[in-house]
C-alpha cells in the first residue's frame, strides 16, 4: 500500500471540507507523516495490519521523546491523537479500510508512566533459556543480547549491518533517528555471541540467497523485520515464564535503567541511547529513584518501625 498517496488524498479532502489555515494543514501532514514513518520502520505495509499495540507503542515513544526528539506536551499529544483519528476516519470512509486501532485512545492529559523494564535476573533468565545448538535459537538469543548490550531501538537492530560491527574493538555503529550515526560499545559476552551467530547460524539461512550486509536475517535469508523481532521478544518472555509482556522497547528501557543503577553518567546514557534531548533520558532517573526509595522503605529500621 502506498502510504504517501493515502496521505495526499487525505490532505486534499481536509482542504475541501475545512477552512483551516495552512498551518493546520501542515500540522496534519507532520503528525501523520511521523506515524507513517514509524509504520515503515516496523515493516508494517498495510493500514489493516496496524494493531492497537502498535498505536500504543507509537504514542508511548512519542510521549517520552523517543520519537520527535523531546517529550510530548499535553497539547501536542492531543493534537497528534486528533490528527490520527481524523486520518483513520478518512481511511474508513473513503479508502475501504475497516480497521481503526486509534478509535479507543482518548485525549486529555498524558498519564506519564515510568518505563517498564526487566530486572537483571529476569533478563538473564530470558537470555539463558535459548538452545545454542539450534540456528533459530542462536539468532534469537543474539538479537536480544545485542539490543540489551547496546540499548538499540528495534528498527536499529533490524537494520544493523555486518560492516558496522567492529568485533576487534567491541564497537558497533548505529544508524539512528534521522540517519544520525552513533558508536556504541558492547561487552565481551555479546562479542562472543555475535561471532557464534555468524559462524554457526547465519550461513544456514543464507544458503539459497545472495550474500548481503544485514546482520540479522530470517530463515529465508532476507533481512529480518522489526515485527519479527517484536514477536521473538514476546515469545522469549513467555518461554522464560516472566510475569510481564515483553516488547523490544522494554529491553532498551532495561539497558538504560541497569546502566544508571550501576552508576553510569546520565549524559553518557543519553549518548548511548541516541537521545537528542536530555529530558528524554531523565525519565530513567525517576525509575532508579523510585527503586532506591523502595529499598529504603523496606530496609531502613526507621522506615520499618514507622509502618
Model feature map: region roles:
Residues 1-307:
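Conserved catalytic core of the tyrosine transesterase superfamily
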Amino acid at each position: 500500500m502506498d502510504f504517501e498517496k493515502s496521505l495526499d488524498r487525505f490532505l486534499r479532502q481536509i482542504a475541501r471540507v475545512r477552512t483551516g489555515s495552512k498551518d493546520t494543514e501542515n500540522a496534519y501532514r507532520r503528525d501523520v507523516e511521523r506515524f507513517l514513518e514509524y509504520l515503515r520502520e516496523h515493516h508494517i505495509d498495510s493500514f489493516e495490519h496496524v494493531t492497537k499495540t502498535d498505536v500504543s507503542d507509537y504514542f508511548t515513544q512519542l510521549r517520552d521523546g523517543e520519537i520527535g526528539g523531546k517529550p510530548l506536551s499535553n497539547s501536542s499529544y492531543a493534537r497528534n491523537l486528533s490528527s490520527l483519528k481524523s486520518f483513520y476516519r478518512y481511511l474508513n470512509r473513503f479508502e475501504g479500510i475497516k480497521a481503526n486501532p486509534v478509535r479507543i485512545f482518548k485525549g486529555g492529559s498524558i498519564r506519564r508512566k515510568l518505563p517498564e523494564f526487566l530486572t537483571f535476573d529476569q533478563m538473564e533468565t530470558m537470555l539463558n533459556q535459548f538452545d545454542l545448538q539450534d540456528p533459530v535459537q542462536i539468532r534469537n538469543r543474539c538479537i536480544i543480547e545485542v539490543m540489551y548490550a547496546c540499548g538499540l531501538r528495534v528498527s536499529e537492530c533490524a537494520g544493523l549491518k555486518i560492516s558496522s560491527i567492529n568485533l576487534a574493538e567491541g564497537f558497533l555503529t548505529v544508524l539512528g533517528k534521522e540517519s544520525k550515526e552513533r558508536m556504541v560499545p558492547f561487552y565481551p559476552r555479546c562479542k562472543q555471541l555475535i561471532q557464534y551467530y555468524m559462524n554457526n547460524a547465519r550461513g544456514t539461512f543464507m544458503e539459497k540467497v545472495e550474500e548481503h550486509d544485514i546482520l540479522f536475517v530470517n530463515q529465508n535469508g532476507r533481512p529480518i523485520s522489526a515485527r519479527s523481532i517484536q514477536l521473538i521478544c514476546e515469545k522469549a518472555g513467555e518461554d522464560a515464564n516472566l510475569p510481564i509482556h515483553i516488547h523490544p522497547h522494554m529491553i532498551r528501557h532495561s539497558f538504560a535503567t541497569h546502566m544508571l543503577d550501576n552508576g553510569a553518567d546520565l549524559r553518557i546514557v543519553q549518548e548511548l541511547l541516541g537521545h537528542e534531548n536530555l529530558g528524554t533520558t531523565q525519565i530513567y532517573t525517576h525509575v532508579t529513584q523510585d527503586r532506591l526509595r523502595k529499598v529504603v522503605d523496606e530496609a531502613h529500621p526507621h522506615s520499618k518501625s514507622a509502618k
